[in-house]
Amino acid sequence: MSDTTAVLLRRGAVVTVSFDPVTGSEAAKVRPAVIVSNNTANAAAARSCGVVTVVPVTSNTARVHPFQVLLPAKATGLPRDSKAQAEQLRAVSVSRIRGAAGWLTSELMDELDEAIRVHLAL
């Protein structure tokens, strides 16, 4: 893991993640994802090649469910409007992170937190 990767491991960062191999309907391939784990856990993961919790992102925005969040390109740094899929929430090894892709605003992060609560019935 590079020093650059350690800097990227912040809650709200949009990073590019290599999700393969996957099973069934899991989000696959190299795609953006939002880091949602807390920064203390993220720092520990960076030191020990541990895991961070992410929400995968897709550019398929035809439907946005209550457990998903529309991510406008202008507000995130992504190349096109996308959506975060809280139903695909998962822990990934920091070794799967390929680089930076953008950031969520605090307002979008609040929406994503709510989408996670809806999905997990918290």
Q: What is each PLM-predicted segment?
A:
Residues 1-122:
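Conserved functional hotspots at enzyme active or ligand-binding sites that engage polyanionic ligands
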